[in-house]
Amino acid sequence: MKKILTLSIILLAVSCAQKPVQQPLDNSVVYEMNVRQYTPEGTFAAAEKQLPRLKDLGVDIVWLMPIYPIGVEGRKGSLGSYYAIKDYCDINPEFGTLADFDSFLAEAHRLGLRVVIDWVANHTSPDAKWVTDAPLYWYERDAEGNLTFTADWSDTANLNYNNPDMCTEMVKSMRFWMERGIDGFRCDMACEVPLEFWERAISELRADYPGMYMLAEGEEPLLHSQCDFDASYSWELHHMMNAIARGEKNIPELLEYLAKDAERQPADAYRLMFTSNHDENSWAGTEFERMGDAAKVMAVLTFTLPGGQPLIYTGQEMGWNHRFAFFEKDPIPAWENNDYTDFYKWLIKTRHDNPALASGDKGGKFEVVSADDSTLVFTRTLPDNKVTVKAELKAPWSYEIVAE
């Protein structure tokens, strides 16, 4: 019996030693993966082989752009938009199979990475499974009974959130993926969906999955205080940084924005900060097109400003200066490490090593040391950790981070 007990303890110790440690959410760095463009193959199987590289880079949360089958009716380009979804509970065959996704997910978890998937709740494709299988009133319709769409999204059909059956099925579809083992969702155009739906969905899912991470594309404070999202987009900050890089905004305006955002957002809100993402890259240009030589110092701000949770988009970690085609195959031909890889590794390690840089109210107090026409110096301070950041926000753009 003593030998059996000893063996059990040894096996338990080995199991615990092998269990990957995930970074706390408040100190995590998000990586947005564009599966179609991530490898020449554009598949989960090929992307899975690259996960150790992401682990080495240091990121913590892998956000997958929509992984579902894409509608054919009204399709844009030859492959279509990821955001025109035909079936919420299946995989785009372009990327592989559900088994391939499960393998990708298992490998990510083995490496200690969280995986969240893009959730497009506002609309489906006009030939979606629900259009053909569900009652007519699951969708918004015009006076003639035709499906409706927003803006120029003619490859989509707006859902009807006044219908409780549709809402119930939407939560059920989200649960399908949580049961499969994902760690949460990035919710597209979150404010285009009634906040009451998010409040219900998050409450019901968190009852069974308390660690679920929720990221909203939107800036409405109620996304946090009412709906209980963890993180929300800092779109206004992003556009402010673009404008500073062009010489159209200045340091006082940046500080005014930060004070306003801190006042209106809940203290524990994570504010997603970025110099690029899939929308900006494809439609507004790369960070180098928009920010020029200021791109690196702006990235430093996304890792160090108060409340922030930093995001890295596909290719940024090697300085990939290319607008990805949105509706076609346009992959990175090969991955290589360079000075941008070293830069982002340094930024991520600096964040992980300094609790004062954590998101929400877990991070250190923000204080401006000095600010003039070109230079901003600020500190983030906890009782046992202090980080000083110096950012030159005019040419020659530069940065310095000192931790103590």
Regions found by a protein language model. Give the residues of each.
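Sec-dependent N-terminal signal peptides
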Residues: 4-13
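A cross-domain feature marking catalytic cores of carbohydrate-active enzymes
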Residues: 35, 66, 117-123, 189-191, ...
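A structural motif
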Residues: 59, 182-183, 229, 307
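Active-site-proximal helices and loops of the catalytic beta/alpha 8
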Residues: 105, 172, 188-274, 292, ...
